[in-house]
UniProtKB/Swiss-Prot annotation:
NCBIfam families: L29. It comes from the Bacteria. This is Large ribosomal subunit protein uL29. SUPFAM superfamilies: Ribosomal protein L29 (L29p). The gene is rpmC. It comes from Burkholderia mallei (strain ATCC 23344). Keywords: Ribonucleoprotein, Ribosomal protein. One of its GO terms (biological process) is translation.
Length: 64
């Protein structure tokens, strides 16, 4: 997800997106631990998406 898309969302939608990404990251980590994960680059993508969402949330909080 692009940062420009995230900037257009409100804080509630960003929190929901963050929650969904954290659940996805947990699932991917469990798949990795049980050796069921074939595409390990998904972990990196999800981790960076989480960072993007948190960055946008911080920016919006600092604007107020």
């Amino acid at each position: 997800m692009k940062a420009s898309e995230l900037l257009q969302k409100d804080q509630a939608a960003l929190n929901k997106e963050l929650s969904d990404l954290l659940k996805a990251q947990f699932g991917l980590r469990m798949q990795l631990a049980t050796q069921q994960l074939t595409n390990t680059s998904q972990l990196k993508k999800v981790r960076r998406d989480i960072a993007r969402v948190r960055t946008v949330l911080t920016q919006k909080a600092n604007q107020k």
